[in-house]
UniProtKB/Swiss-Prot annotation:
Coiled coil: none annotated. It comes from the Bacteria. Substrate binds at N40, Y180, V181, I182, A183, E184, Y204, K209, L210. The record marks N40, E184 as: Could have a critical role in the catalytic mechanism. Changing H205E: Strong decrease of L-leucyl-tRNA(Leu) binding. Its EC number is 2.3.2.22. It comes from Bacillus licheniformis (strain ATCC 14580 / DSM 13 / JCM 2505 / CCUG 7422 / NBRC 12200 / NCIMB 9375 / NCTC 10341 / NRRL NRS-1264 / Gibson 46). Changing Y180A: Moderate decrease in the cyclodileucine synthase activity. NCBIfam families: tRNA_cyclodipep. The gene is yvmC. Changing Y204A: Strong decrease in the cyclodileucine synthase activity. This is Cyclo(L-leucyl-L-leucyl) synthase. GO terms for molecular function: aminoacyltransferase activity.
Amino acid sequence: MTELIMESKHQLFKTETLTQNCNEILKRRRHVLVGISPFNSRFSEDYIHRLIAWAVREFQSVSVLLAGKEAANLLEALGTPHGKAERKVRKEVSRNRRFAEKALEAHGGNPEDIHTFSDFANQTAYRNLRMEVEAAFFDQTHFRNACLEMSHAAILGRARGTRMDVVEVSADMLELAVEYVIAELPFFIAAPDILGVEETLLAYHRPWKLGEQISRNEFAVKMRPNQGYLMVSEADERVESKSMQEERV
């Protein structure tokens, strides 16, 4: 992986690209898709403000990606009733959106460029990509297992975050929670097709084991040449080199 330091008048950010192709996309700095997770204490108003300020300074165009309705599945997997889970997700995503809108407006970005997974549910490009992911999930055991492993880590991470004692993660819990992974993956492999941009980097603060496997061509699902992944951290913290093993929602 390639590591760079980007300096501004206010804040240092460290970036790490997943592949050499990601690094080439980064050099051109045409577009970045900033990922913001719900129920993650990192994404405070101040952090989102700093992150988006950095993104607007460094890239020609900035979009923000928020969770969709599938985030409720993780809460349901841990026992939250369906209706309550949906309400909690709507409230949290609204909070994330409000902070992102405020930051984009403050730094010259476009508040209209904030999206959730669910916004594209009926879009042809997104639906085709999701079908591609779902086909691999059902046809390739090793891809299915990798997705379920990510869901397992997310369930345990969410349980830790809420101080819940989970004795065993059942198959039903995994099947419910994995919907979030499936909904998110199209933005990892081909976000330009969805957003209508030439190329982009999906920016997040951690490595992603499943993404690393995709970038190594271990599955039928492939990252497109105009798609990259970028790990971003503030200078006083370390971009973790270990594979991601915490919740993304």
